[in-house]
Amino acid sequence: MLENENGRSNLSSMLDGYQKSNNNSINLHLAKDQKLIIKRTDQVSLEPIPVKTTTTLKQGLYIVGADIKPGRYIAKQTSKDSTNNLTLYNDNYRLKTNEILTNRKMKSSKSVKPKPQTAIDIKKNDIITIYGKGTTQLEPQ
């Protein structure tokens, strides 16, 4: 479970195995005052990764300003048969965007309308989470 300074979690289902995933790793950047609580340490290994900005997003959590440069982007699902859930939060953990990105044909509902791409405006300290086994590419606009 990942908690912010208010004890609110925003990645618990991705990390606790509640939802099945074909991924065996995630990238995670802990910001100031965030805690990672690991309950089953025998099943987890932690390795530091170099911090550099990217526009290629796999499953994980990304901090704008540390992992991704602020700006306007088109977020595209680049994997042919995969689906990703892209969520964007502001620095107070308020949801700004929640999109299902896929190139597959899927049924839409009133609340879920999958699409291959979406435009996003991201600011320093915004948080992007990607859940799924595909790759999401951010193209600067």
Segments from the language model and where they lie:
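A short tyrosine-centered beta-strand micro-motif
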Residues: 1, 62, 73-75
